[in-house]
């Protein structure tokens, strides 16, 4: 059970009914005008097992600090929206077993019912924007699931990218998804998709999906400038920055496709649906790859955190 930490700086609620708490580090950064990078918490609670999840979370936060920015891991704890977690809270969240996975549809529910919830990409974007944080680092976004023409399973992440003005740095859409359809939805919704230092859109564990990226840029400063001009033009919505996993850590896309197909077949046999699909597939792929998928996942998250911090610093220059 997560304890109620007293080591927090309570701030004026975003609205009269919404309790929000900034960690001391984040509150200090906001006061100084220091660059901030938002981090989701679902990757901690639903993405990998303990203690690997807490080690990854600490490493990612340290990487952001090394680049001159401040990490802000976002979660709902006992109905309070936390922007930044103290060390003890991060540890407790990593060990917790009964944590909601909250998106746009149920973020308010978790707060209203005083639940504890880990934020998805969509929920983290909402919280980051409310807190004035312009950059967010994650592993991979959700998107259009394979077979969506029958299941209609499409992640709320795509709609959030069209609505909320946050730069999301990721390693592309998760490769378990239908990447071409995911990119089509993003194009339809007017979301700019920029691949960093590559002409090809990445596929999470693999550096290339075989699909040409809509846009590409080669420096954090160029990405920051692009977003600044969008804001000056009054263009709503976020930007997706796809950062290919380091070459030394990737799993070839041809090899990954074999594992993904096996995992999808298993999910169909077990009749897995809804929010349970992605965690199930990731867990199955972990087993099929003898843990290599998790090692690659950690490497790409760390790589994304580094780029996100560089972009956040560039936005402040």
Curated annotation (Swiss-Prot):
Leading EC class: lyase
The UniProt record gives the binding positions of substrate as 101, 121, 155-157
The cofactor remark states: Binds 1 Mn(2+) ion per subunit.
Q: Which Gene3D superfamilies match?
A: Indigoidine synthase domain (3.40.1790.10)
Q: In this record, what's one Pfam family?
A: Indigoidine_A
Provide the Gene Ontology terms for cellular component.
cytoplasm
Q: So what does this thing catalyse?
A: D-ribose 5-phosphate + uracil = psi-UMP + H2O
Task: List GO molecular-function terms, semicolon-separated.
Answer: hydrolase activity, acting on glycosyl bonds; metal ion binding; pseudouridylate synthase activity
Its annotated function is as follows: Catalyzes the reversible cleavage of pseudouridine 5'-phosphate (PsiMP) to ribose 5-phosphate and uracil. Functions biologically in the cleavage direction, as part of a pseudouridine degradation pathway.
Give the family this protein belongs to, as stated in its UniProt record.
Answer: Belongs to the pseudouridine-5'-phosphate glycosidase family.
Q: Subunit notes for this chain? A: Homotrimer.
| Entry protein name | Pseudouridine-5'-phosphate glycosidase 1
Gene name, per UniProt, is: psuG1
